[in-house]
Amino acid sequence: MAPFEIGLVMPIAQFGPERTTPRWPVIREIALRAEAMGFDTLWTPDELLWRAEDGPPQGVWDGVSMAGAVAATTSRVKVGTWVLSALHRNPGIIAKTAETLDEISGGRFVFGLGAGHEWPGQARAFGLPEDRIFARFEEALRIIVPLIRTGHADFEGQYHAARDLPQQPVGPRPNAIPLLIGGNGLKGQRHAALHADIWSGYAEERAHVDELGPRLATLDAICDEVGRDPATIGRGAGISVNPLQPAGWRPTAISGPAEEIADTLRSFREAGFTQVDLMLGPGTLEAVEALAPVLELVRAD
């Protein structure tokens, strides 16, 4: 059985009614403490701006910059993008970014990648494309994957191009940076089956294995369809967690005593997931510390 990994999505967005902004000294302290606690991967989300219907905009620090800073601050834990949006950047530059982050981390980088999205208004606010998102992603993959797997890309598409483009310089793992493709839909799973080391979904409505578990059978079927052994792809689940709130606080987040949170993580492992990545609320050191007994319980099994 593959090892079961637990990751932490770093709190780099404004949070709470007062839109509290986590500052770098706090983010750095959280990263170091999470590494010491034994988290397997620290992820930085790649969002730009959230516009809530009932409140002011919610800002987010740049995820790539934060990934580099976290990688330079830590020494053992893996560091990844969760997930880097192909909608925000040129695909050749995305591949170079991944190579650079692997260099900064000394070979600890996990390249989380996704199609991106237009909601809730961030694409429009930044003047980014709002249409044909998956068509754009398919073209981006025809540049990114060859660059990180063979060191070269040559492609001319409707939305993207790479003309005799070499992947230079290269970091400590030429052609071998692990690729995670995120997305709940069939298209995301198919791209993962074709190109990625790991597929990851995320629980939107309920922080429960019943929401994401059925997608594993779909992933297996897609792997069979494209001629891939389903056992060769990792399976991730992103779930929200608030260890400072009582059990049953919200259906979209796991909460309550450490044993109850640990039981939820175990249920994902038993369903066949190889990793869970925890989206922490609130983004404080106190909340991270409250997860220490959860990790101990799951690791003790």
Language-model features, listed with the residues they occupy:
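Conserved, mostly hydrophobic/aromatic
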Residues: 34, 38, 46, 70, ...
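Alpha-helical segments flanking ligand/cofactor-binding loops in enzyme cores
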Residues: 25-28, 32, 68, 99, ...
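A structural motif
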Residues: 36-39, 106, 196, 270-273
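N-terminal beta1-alpha1-beta2 module of alpha/beta enzyme domains
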Residues: 1-73, 177, 279-289, 294-297, ...
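An alpha-helical appendage that flanks or caps ligand/catalytic pockets
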Residues: 1-2, 10, 35, 126, ...
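Hydrophobic faces of well-ordered beta-strands that scaffold small-molecule active sites
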Residues: 6-10, 42-44, 78-81, 109-113, ...
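Active-site mouth loops of central-metabolism enzymes
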Residues: 10-25, 82-92, 174-184, 245-259
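Flexible, glycine-rich active-site loops centered on histidine and acidic residues
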Residues: 5-22, 84-154, 202-211
